[in-house]
Amino acid sequence: MPRPEPSPATVADSVTGILDAALVEFERHGLRRVALDDVARRAGVSRTTIYRRFANRDELVAAVIERENVALFADIANELKSAGPQSNYYVEAFTLSILRFRRHHVLNQLIADEPALVMEMLHTHYGAAIERMAAALKVIFPAGFAERIGEQSVNDLADTILRYAGMVLLLPSVEPLDTPEDLRAFATRHFLPSLPASLRTVSA
């Protein structure tokens, strides 16, 4: 008699448990040193179960990073929203994005240890990243601002933030980019002038 298919809830619970276990392993041992057997052991499942959910190790890493990015964007939006009015929402959104990313142990480690994988994931998931950043900006902006500048301008801003964030996180720099003040200065000198014309003429 064939074994019954697991329910969607069971599958979701299994995936969540695997992702939770992988995140702990990555935090404790680094991305390069963690094998699927380590994740399976911590999750309390077999290696075969992991392969039913993820084709290979890189796919598991990508799923962990995707989930953490979703949470990170939501945290950034909520933090800026609760901080109250800002002198420049563009600069603050950019600065906080960099700071929060660097504070996330696994995401920051991914940049340092697996830059090639980062670029591959960007090629695959960049559209989704823009959508997440645009959604975060709509939370951050004052009421009615996103509607005033229009959907395309919000998406353009999200794209520009991500491109300049990638520059700061992935490329070496001749100027210091360590402190919030350094990042705000960089954003003012380089990021703001690069914004689409539709945004430069409207202040958030």
Q: What do these predicted ranges mean?
A:
Residues 70-73, 109, 118-148, 152-162:
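Amphipathic alpha-helical packing segments from all-alpha helical-bundle domains
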Residues 18-26, 72, 76, 97:
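Short hydrophobic clusters on alpha-helical segments that form packing/core surfaces
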Residues 63, 77-103, 158-161:
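Hydrophobic alpha-helical connector segments
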Residues 48:
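Key DNA-contact positions within bacterial/archaeal DNA-binding proteins
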Residues 99-103, 159-178, 190-200:
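Amphipathic C-terminal alpha-helical segment
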Residues 1-42, 55, 59-62, 67:
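Basic, helix-initiating cap at the start of DNA-binding domains
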Residues 1-13, 175, 195-204:
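N-terminal intrinsically disordered/low-complexity leader segments
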